[in-house]
Amino acid sequence: HRKALLGNLVCSLVEHGRIKTTVSKAKEARPLAEKMITLAKRGDLAARRKAVARLRSKEAVHTLFAELGPRYEDRPGGYTRIVRLGQRQGDAAEMAYLELVE
């Protein structure tokens, strides 16, 4: 369940560029997102297969390898940022944006 949750969060991040989630989930999803972008920078078949195995969405993997890999080619890591938003109405969970840097 945890792997599926993180994979879905990263898929949404790749598709939309920014997702709104709890701080805890953002902190957990961030390392996976960074690893997936690093795989996309490699760009070989083995990297693509590893990405498909983790994300389970061919559309997200295509976007990752076609757009994000080339975009971050010269950047040595640090592809995402967490922006805190305050507490959610209802259960007071600390919310944040997990977004891709330019």
Regions found by a protein language model. Give the residues of each.
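Structured, basic alpha/beta domains of bacterial-type, RNA-associated proteins
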Residues: 1-102
